[in-house]
């Protein structure tokens, strides 16, 4: 079981690297970077799920650290080089901050800028909460508590991804994707209200 978990981790991180390497260059458009961010965020949700259901605390910590690396990037305070991705990556929080500086120029309409600004703040907040929960999981000594922290991490990542539920709607990443017309590139249906 332990070998299968580690093999899964390697496959997941190769996918993260492939998505991340798809464009670290400055010349990529806001739309392209949003699509990459969404793909990496989905990978983060997968890592959080794998961590939450890991059979051992060591396995959970491995996946939690991979997620911390994905969130913070290689220049992050909690980045650990031995845990994939080993290459330099900007991190979801850094990428979201960069994108936030480009939205006003990309959207001429004041109403769209306000909506996108709110969504961008929500995404950054949810990603920050996810990072805090993953770091808490790394410090836990009991697997049941660490698993709960990783489920909380998953919930924050899911909120950042913005798949609305029947009860409430909080604008986040899907609002950004709709604003830039790139939801089709993800091969997914647009959530209700989009």
Where are these regions (language model features)?
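Mature extracytoplasmic or organellar-lumen-exposed domains after removal of signal/transit peptides
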Residues: 25-194
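Sec/Tat signal peptide C-region and signal peptidase I cleavage site
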Residues: 19-23
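Bacterial N-terminal signal peptides
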Residues: 9-18
């Amino acid at each position: 079981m332990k070998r299968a978990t580690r093999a899964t981790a390697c496959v997941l991180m190769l996918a993260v690297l492939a998505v991340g390497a798809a464009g670290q260059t400055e010349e990529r458009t806001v739309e392209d970077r949003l699509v990459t961010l969404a793909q990496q965020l989905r990978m983060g949700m997968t890592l959080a799920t794998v961590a939450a259901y890991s059979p051992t605390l060591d396995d959970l910590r491995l996946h939690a650290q991979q997620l911390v690396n994905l969130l913070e990037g290689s220049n992050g305070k909690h980045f650990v080089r031995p845990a994939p991705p080993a290459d330099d990556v900007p991190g979801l929080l850094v990428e979201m901050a960069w994108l936030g500086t480009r939205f006003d120029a990309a959207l001429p309409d004041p109403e769209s800028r306000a909506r996108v600004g709110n969504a961008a703040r929500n995404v950054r907040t949810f990603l920050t909460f996810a990072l805090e929960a993953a770091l808490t999981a790394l410090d836990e000594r009991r697997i049941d508590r660490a698993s709960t922290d990783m489920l909380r991490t998953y919930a924050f990542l899911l909120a950042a991804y913005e798949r609305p539920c029947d009860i409430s709607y909080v604008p986040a990443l899907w609002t950004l994707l709709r604003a830039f017309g790139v939801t089709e590139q993800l091969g997914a249906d647009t959530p209700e209200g989009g």
